Design a protein with these regions (language model features):
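Active-site activation/catalytic loop segments of kinase-like enzymes and analogous catalytic loops
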Residues: 227-258, 271-290
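A general structural signal marking secondary-structure boundaries and capping sites
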Residues: 25, 83-86, 96, 115-116, ...
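Charged catalytic carboxylate motif
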Residues: 13, 74, 129, 133, ...
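Short secondary-structure junctions
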Residues: 25-33
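ATP-binding pocket architecture of kinase catalytic cores
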Residues: 32-149, 182
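An alpha-helical support segment within catalytic cores of ATP-dependent transferases
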Residues: 6-26, 136-190, 194-209, 257, ...
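Active-site acidic catalytic loop and adjacent metal/ATP-binding pocket
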Residues: 35-47, 53-54, 58-59, 92, ...
């Protein structure tokens, strides 16, 4: 096996486990680290057959992740649920949630074509595609509901960025001191954002982009669609500027999505998710820099978060 670099090497037990789930005559010939995720280490495994052809699988390894067994069980269950729904998700090959066979809890799945696209170019084309894909996810009606959503950020855990608009942030924190508004539950991805969506897009034709896959289903939940909308909006705001966060919410409605009926209810979910980023700016910005957005330093992302929260609090309605 040839590794692209030392980091790409699959741990011995995980390699043996993955190999046991190949077709007769196949073997793993190459591995490659896939960047962009936060929850798990992700590697592409190139699988060679006797006849000379190859196919790819993806190995997700949950190293040092609290509640890894739970995360992995949820993702495996979601992948089985999504089969046949029309949502472009990976197919489940095997799961080892308790690390009975691997060094760490691991998940083996099919590889989807495409790549994540985090560049500014072509964003006006991709935002409506993201919105339509999220509407399709929310249209899923599972026979068995996933667990209810969990929102861990509280008014007391918010970290106000240095130099932030104190008035806007105080008002935003006061918003999430209130009880959550009532909602009609739907199936949620719960981590839907550009880093978890794969596109087929030619560099010379960014306007011809199409979505080929949605990945990282470990946080699937049941809850208000506004949570998913808010999460993607916040990611877009930090990646591309606050205006794009607000634009995504509009695009979701234009695509047929049904957010909360009142502006105050929508604001609650948007603010809650935006403030959650205040606790993990370093964590979320590192994969973006690894993916080529080197200008997105922690400070730049903090400034964009401040501008986004301020824009939410200044928005009419």
């Amino acid at each position: 096996m040839t590794d692209h670099d030392e980091a790409a090497a699959v741990r011995p037990l995980a390699l043996a486990w993955a190999s046991r789930h190949l077709e007769a005559g196949e073997r793993i010939v190459r591995t490659e680290v896939l960047h962009g995720g936060v929850t798990a280490e992700t590697r592409r495994l190139a699988v060679g057959a006797r006849g000379g052809g190859t196919r790819d699988l993806v190995l997700r390894t949950f190293v040092g992740v609290e509640h890894a067994e739970d995360w992995l069980d949820r993702e495996a269950g979601a992948l089985m649920l999504l089969k046949g729904t029309g949502v472009p998700a990976p197919g489940l090959v095997a799961a080892d949630p308790t690390a009975a066979y691997c060094e760490y809890p691991s998940l083996l799945m099919t590889h989807l074509a495409g790549r994540t696209v985090l560049d500014d170019e072509g964003l006006e084309t991709r935002v409506p595609l993201l919105a339509r894909q999220l509407v399709a996810i929310h249209a899923i009606r599972p026979a068995e509901r996933p667990r209810e959503y969990v929102a861990l950020t509280t008014a007391d855990t918010v970290v106000t960025p240095k130099g932030a608009d104190a008035v806007a942030w105080t008002a935003a924190i006061d918003v999430i001191r209130q009880p959550a508004p009532p909602y009609e539950g739907r199936f949620l991805h719960r981590d839907f954002h550009p880093g978890n969506v794969l596109f087929d897009v030619a560099p010379a034709r960014p306007a011809g982009a199409r979505i080929t896959g949605v990945v990282d289903w470990a946080a699937t939940s049941w809850g208000p669609v506004d949570l998913d909308v808010a999460h993607c909006s916040a990611n877009l705001a930090l990646l591309h500027g606050p205006a794009w966060g607000l634009r995504f919410a509009e695009a979701y409605e234009e695509a047929g999505g049904m957010p909360a009926s009142t502006a105050s209810e929508r604001l609650y979910w948007w603010v809650r998710d935006g403030l959650a980023f205040s606790e993990e700016v370093r964590l979320v910005s590192q994969p973006w820099r690894e993916a080529g957005r080197t200008e997105l330093t922690t400070r730049v992302v903090e400034e964009r978060l401040d501008a986004y929260v301020t824009a939410l609090m200044d928005a009419p309605g």
